[in-house]
């Protein structure tokens, strides 16, 4: 009997904790009446009600499912227990900085550039932003999906699922040990710095969402910790937990030194970098580079004269060793799949949305291919999901598809290439060609004498100035 009661007791405690968290956020919101607290993102006045509403949705879904969702270690119940305890701790820290309820004006010290109180509040606002993004990613609409969460980078996803199984969160010490099996971590200060970088919510745990953000920031996977060490630990231009406004303030001292720059993880586009730099006319601009490793962006920016002096310092670290070209990536299309394309009077290379241009973009994490014009038009319509599978678009990579003559085709050799996988991100993932949407009006097919091959391109794009909202690059 006691065994049957225990789960219900935990569900009851969880429901109470969710209710307490919502009420706590409401009280905190009442302390955020000063309009200066919502000048630029991340804004506590915006984040608090959104987080409270998401927690209500989580509570409703949990009640409807009888506390459901995958349980067990590192499952939904463990995540909420850790999350709510961390939320309470961070809320108390914010409450101590804000004026009491009923008082409309906050301490001017909170808004003075460079003050200790402002730095503390800005960091806590960023942590709250991370916590809202994490909860939204693992409980979209209040329903748990952590056991099905897809990491953006295929090798990172493979590592997590093989090492952590269906868990969505685990203690730092255990995660550090698991990561060390493929990316050894030096104990001491290096391990502490790594924990500070990965643990976006400062909870002492690592969630699958936080690891996803980390692996997107410090891609590619084979040199993950080397990239992190050179870009975050050793680079004078790296700034953690900094907002748009704070970047503007920090670079004010460098306005007479064009080419000065600093970079930070974007507050509002998690998994992407934001780079602030001083232009040739002394203006301070900020940009979010489009879906390529930061080392490559900084090398290109240095070559073009944009990123020369990290944080105004004369020495610019040499990142050449991180900018080596990655091996070409191939997609082997099986004979059966090719037959499907030919039956539609199409080819693998042709974009299946417009049926006019060749595919030149790979969507992440789902891996579907289409042409850049169709992707731009699709995202311009405010759609942030893949047009084929409706998976969230977290990024994309430019690709070039061309005929590969290095081996006989499946048709010529008489051997099916069904067993050949697709090599992406220097790791193996299952064979998967994009789905074939119904298109009766496709143009005539091209000769079928070769298999396509996909290769990542490394193109340049000049920095584009941003506003404080950190919009995605065009």
Curated annotation (Swiss-Prot):
Pfam families: Cbl_N (PF02262), Cbl_N2 (PF02761), Cbl_N3 (PF02762), zf-C3HC4_3 (PF13920). This is E3 ubiquitin-protein ligase CBL-C. GO terms for cellular component: membrane raft; plasma membrane. The gene is CBLC. EF-hand-like and Sh2-like domains are required for N-terminal inhibition of E3 activity. InterPro entries: Adaptor_Cbl, Adaptor_Cbl_EF_hand-like, Adaptor_Cbl_N_dom_sf, Adaptor_Cbl_N_hlx, Adaptor_Cbl_SH2-like, Cbl_PTB, EF-hand-dom_pair, SH2_dom_sf. Changing residue 264 to A: Abolishes interaction with EGFR. Decreases interaction with SRC and abolishes SRC ubiquitination. Residues 7-321 form the Cbl-PTB domain. Residues 146-218 are annotated as: EF-hand-like.
């Amino acid at each position: 009997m006691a065994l049957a009661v225990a789960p219900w007791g935990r569900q009851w405690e969880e429901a109470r904790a969710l209710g307490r968290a919502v009420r706590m956020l409401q009280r905190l919101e009442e302390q955020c009446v000063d309009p200066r607290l919502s000048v630029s993102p991340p804004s506590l006045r915006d984040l608090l009600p959104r987080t409270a509403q998401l927690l209500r949705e989580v509570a409703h879904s949990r009640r409807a499912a009888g506390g459901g969702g995958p349980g067990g270690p590192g499952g939904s119940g463990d995540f909420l227990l850790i999350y709510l305890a961390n939320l309470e701790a961070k809320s108390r820290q914010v409450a101590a900085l804000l004026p009491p309820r009923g008082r409309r004006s906050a301490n001017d010290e909170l808004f003075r550039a460079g003050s200790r109180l402002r730095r503390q509040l800005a960091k806590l606002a960023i942590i709250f932003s991370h916590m809202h993004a994490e909860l939204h990613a693992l409980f979209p609409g209040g329903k748990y999906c952590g056991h099905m969460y897809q990491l953006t980078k295929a090798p990172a996803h493979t590592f997590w699922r093989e090492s952590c199984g269906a868990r969505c969160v685990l203690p730092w010490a255990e995660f550090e040990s698991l990561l060390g099996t493929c990316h050894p971590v030096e104990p001491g200060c290096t391990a502490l710095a790594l924990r500070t970088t990965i643990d976006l919510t400062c909870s002492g745990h690592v969630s699958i969402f936080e690891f996803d953000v980390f692996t997107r920031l410090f891609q590619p996977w084979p040199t993950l910790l080397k990239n992190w060490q050179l870009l975050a630990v050793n680079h004078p231009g790296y700034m953690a937990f900094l907002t748009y406004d704070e970047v503007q303030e920090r670079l004010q001292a460098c306005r007479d030194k064009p080419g000065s720059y600093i970079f930070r993880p974007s507050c509002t586009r998690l998994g992407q970098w934001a780079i602030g730099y001083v232009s040739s006319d002394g203006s301070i601009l900020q940009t979010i580079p489009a879906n390529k490793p930061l080392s490559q962006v900084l090398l290109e920016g240095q070559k073009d004269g944009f990123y020369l002096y990290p944080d105004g310092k004369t020495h610019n670290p040499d990142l050449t060793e991180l900018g080596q070209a990655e091996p070409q990536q191939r997609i082997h299309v099986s004979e059966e799949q090719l037959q499907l394309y030919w039956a539609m009077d199409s080819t693998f290379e042709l974009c299946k949305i417009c049926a006019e241009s060749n595919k030149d973009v790979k969507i992440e994490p789902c891996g579907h291919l289409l042409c850049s014009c169709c992707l731009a038009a699709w995202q311009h319509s405010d759609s942030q999901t893949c047009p084929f599978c409706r998976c969230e678009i977290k990024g994309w990579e430019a690709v070039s598809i061309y005929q590969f003559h290095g081996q006989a085709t499946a048709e010529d050799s008489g051997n099916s290439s069904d067993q050949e996988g697709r090599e992406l991100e220097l790791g193996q993932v299952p064979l998967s060609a994009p789905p074939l949407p119904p298109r009766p009006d496709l143009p005539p097919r091209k000769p079928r004498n070769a298999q396509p091959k996909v290769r990542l391109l490394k193109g340049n794009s000049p920095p584009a100035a941003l506003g404080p909202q950190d919009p995605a690059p065009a």
